[in-house]
A protein has these predicted regions:
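Intrinsically disordered, low-complexity terminal and linker regions enriched in polar/acidic
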Residues: 1-7
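Hydrophobic small-molecule pocket/channel-lining residues, especially in calycin-type beta-barrels
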Residues: 3, 21-154
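Bacterial N-terminal signal peptides
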Residues: 9-18
Length: 154
């Protein structure tokens, strides 16, 4: 193998590993810590979030309650590349995108009919034990909401 090919291969492996380890911070099962969270009036509440690798993609499954207290379950599969991917089971959005900013910081956006209904940031603590999601949006009745949800890794 030529030296140039070796260098290109090593750089490619390094970039792939960096992306995998960055995503690894988000992976796992996360339970809502209601005592540390600030759930705004009219906000949906995700009690459990499961983030797992599925092939080359990431699958995020959320279980919780809507603003009226009814159980919710939604699933999203895609990449942390900022592109929109379909979400199933979320009455407030039909697509969602996640963008990885660095190893522990992510941006999220949800759209319904092409219109942004929710956006925010997700931060994983340096020790990897806490995940904080700060989101703002508009619910199905047009009401505004803002939530800071703190999750503990299980």
């Amino acid at each position: 193998m030529k030296p140039k090919s070796v260098i290109v291969s090593l750089v490619t492996c390094f970039v792939a590993l960096t992306l995998c380890f960055g995503q690894a911070a988000m992976m796992g099962t996360w339970k809502l810590n209601e005592a540390k969270s600030k759930i705004g009036a009219g906000s949906p509440k995700n009690n459990t979030v499961v983030i797992e690798a599925v092939g080359e993609n990431v699958k995020i499954t959320m279980d919780g309650v809507d603003a009226a207290g009814k159980p919710t379950h939604n699933e999203w599969t895609g990449k942390f590349d900022g592109k929109e991917y379909p979400v199933a089971g979320d009455a407030n959005s039909d697509t969602r995108s996640y963008k990885q900013i660095d190893d522990r910081n992510f941006e999220v956006s949800g759209k319904k009919g092409g219109k942004v209904t929710v956006s925010g940031k997700v931060v994983v603590s340096a020790d990897g034990k806490t995940r904080t999601a700060h989101v703002k949006g508009t619910n199905l009745t047009g009401g505004k909401f803002e939530t800071t949800a703190v999750y503990n890794k299980q």
